[in-house]
Amino acid sequence: MGLDYLMVHVKYNIPPALLLTILYKPFFTRLEVYKIVFLCTIAVVWTTPWDSYLIRTRVWSYPADSVIGHTIFRIPLEEAFFFIIQTYNTSLIYILFNKRLILLPYLSGPIKPLTQGLFGTVALRTWRDFGILFFTGISVLGISCIRAGGEYMYLGLILSWISPILLLQWPLMYRFLLGLPPASLWVPIVLPTLYLWIVDTLALRRGTWVIESGTKVDIQLWDGLELEEALFFLVTNVMIVLGIAGMDNAIALFEYKAFVSTTAVGETPSIPRLLTLFFTRSRRYCDTNVLREMSQAVTLLKQKSQTMYLGSAMFEGQLRLDLVALYSFCRKADDLIDDAPNRATAQYWIKQCEKALELRFKLKGAALDNTAAYQQLTKSIPPQLHAAVHLLPASRLPKGPLSDLLKGFEIDMKFDSERGIFPIATEHDLEVYAYHVAGTIATLLLELVFRHHPVSISDSERLRVISAGEGMGRALQYTNIARDIVRDAEIGRVYIPSVWLAEQGLTPSMVVNQPRNPKLIPLRRRLLDKAEKCYRDTQEAISELPANVRAPVRATVTVYMDIGQVIRENEMKVWNGKLKVSRWRRFKGAWLAMS
């Protein structure tokens, strides 16, 4: 009896698990727990017979003085625990690195060709066939090594053990895997593999476990690390990552089905349902228009607001997709109107948005993948609006706040710095504007929250919470205005109320001509004070939201409001356009808000 193997866990395997758990604990979702538990179960079930055979046939062994002595099918308890702890750690690294990803667009495969050269673009089906041949070759090689026996035995057992899993997974999920960002796969494979190589080297040198001579090829990657051991840790991490990616593939299929529906809301899939989707439903059942448009919406969100993109990761499934689709419409409409070369073109786009909304809500009873409804919608509106309007979850949203949003854009159109026209004259004007361009979006967000996660509160209470949400949106808009004084002045707009400017001896025209005037600093602070008051006033309302979205809403708003604190800390950088909130600061803010 000994404690060597147990101490390997205590020193090297459990500490990373604890650290990863502490880092990720506030963000854990029920579905992620399901995924990890399921994968750990599969790891134990698949590995136990194989490992037991290796021990019984003396491919490897454990000295009596390195293990406590209790076994399961001749496998030391410490080894059985390793199946679980490795799967847990690798799965959690994968989840950490991929939390930000919106899975749905990856069902369509890679956006850009993976290989272009002398033979042209390699088709996705060619990659599928190549993968099948490759993993079949691994299986054949493994069987050949086993038949040869001797020094090739351990290598053959590893290859023949992994190949059935890879052959099963690849044809069903190759498109999804090839669509994912490469780093989302190789980082969760490489990091734990390198770490375990180091741990294994130390254990082999100490004799904690032994690969018997005559069953290995006697090639070492470095002193103390046998080729077979290095391969074992690499392929086990590959299987874990592909396993959890396979579950993400099934989740994406489930989310697609819910997203295009007009009735499904707030569901969390069970593991049996995900397995059914994985084995029976493929990307062929997904509408290419929906996948393409969601990919465009995600790209737009990442380009325009990293804070909102990362904030959206706090939400789950269909609700997150609905929020991305909502943001896509708001952002696209804003860009078309703001980037218009003249006032007439801007007015044209406002009218087109109104027309598109009217038609979209008339068709709200049709599923998103309804071809006839899609054709009816797209033939009646400009191509620039097709994706943004089509994706809108109209069956789950009221139309009123979206119409009010367009009124905010109409206020923007009233600015005319050459003629000295600035519509934000009073603090009331500022509040009205902030409601139209941001309070409406917060209202729509809460409408989606209550639709996906109904709670038993009275209509009056629900309206009170939504009204407080309008204040939450205004708080974010006041922060935006404080941040963008210089940028807004460059396009002839001043959102600081004229009466505030007059108190400092300024006019809007003076701000346009000199947006870095030091006299604006106290006014910017005043905007931030107003934002923080609105934010504080919403805290009680946030606490009344459904439990599973309360923390995500608080985290998203808190992280965005931290921009105001960064502005206060870096006032000169704001003038020079160098303001940037670090990812670590955003993560820290979200972690504290979610805890």
From Swiss-Prot:
N-terminal signal peptide: none
Catalysed transformations (reactions): all-trans-lycopene = gamma-carotene; gamma-carotene = all-trans-beta-carotene; 2 (2E,6E,10E)-geranylgeranyl diphosphate = 15-cis-phytoene + 2 diphosphate
Pathway recorded for this protein: Carotenoid biosynthesis; beta-carotene biosynthesis; Carotenoid biosynthesis; phytoene biosynthesis; all-trans-phytoene from geranylgeranyl diphosphate: step 1/1
One GO process term, biological-process aspect: carotenoid biosynthetic process
Region Phytoene synthase: start-end pairs: 256-595
Membrane-topology annotation of the record: Multi-pass membrane protein
Stored InterPro entries: Isoprenoid_synthase_dom_sf (IPR008949), Lycopene_cyclase_dom (IPR017825), Squ/phyt_synthse (IPR002060), Squalene/phytoene_synthase_CS (IPR019845), Trans_IPPS_bact-type (IPR044843), Trans_IPPS_HH (IPR033904)
The keyword Transmembrane is assigned to this record: yes
GO cellular component term, pick one: membrane
SUPFAM superfamilies the UniProt entry points to: Terpenoid synthases
Region of interest (Lycopene beta-cyclase), residue spans: 1-249
Primary role: Bifunctional enzyme that catalyzes the reactions from geranylgeranyl diphosphate to phytoene (phytoene synthase) and lycopene to beta-carotene via the intermediate gamma-carotene (lycopene cyclase).
PANTHER family referenced in this protein's UniProt entry, alphabetically: BIFUNCTIONAL LYCOPENE CYCLASE/PHYTOENE SYNTHASE (PTHR31480)
Protein name: Bifunctional lycopene cyclase/phytoene synthase
